[in-house]
Amino acid sequence: MSIGLSNIYSSDVVKHAKKVIVEINDKMPYTYGNNIINVKDVDYIVPVSYPLPQDVPPAPNEKDRMIAGHIAEYLKDGDCVQIGIGGIPNSVTEFLAEKKDLGIHTELLGDGLAKLAMRGVVNGSKKQFMKGKIVTSIVMGTDVVYDFVNKNPDVYVMSCSKCNDPYTVRKNKNQVSINTTLEVDLTGQACSEAIG
């Protein structure tokens, strides 16, 4: 069985858990990756049926669009992108429609990147690691991305511990990361998790 939309720690935890209780939602997309659990490893199954949360990205403001347009100029055909959460990163995807052969290796796959893949802008043909695959740990957005990933063999949901491991990320040449951050210190380190 597939873990579904998020493999932040789930596949790692299941290997070490004394009891495994899973909730099976008939509305959950089936995804491929290292997020597959053998039913023999499950102690309890709880069947449910409820709609998935719809995380509609905020409409970008003029400043977001201006910054996003500037950022998009730096991306080249064949780059492998990681795009984080937030208004500016979401806006960047709107400026990438004319690019070619983009790859995706990202922690979070949302509507914007899914739309690029559906348009053929993303094909992963220039990636060195998992060529042709869209690699992610979390799928979050609306039914646009949920429908896109459902039973899509081109999408690989990887455990966060591997997806975000610098050793894994560096396997793709021309990996470009676009993120919003909360703090930057004097040495250039950026913190996107918390302030303080």
Predicted regions and their residues:
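Conserved phosphate- and dinucleotide-binding cores of soluble alpha/beta proteins
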Residues: M1-G196
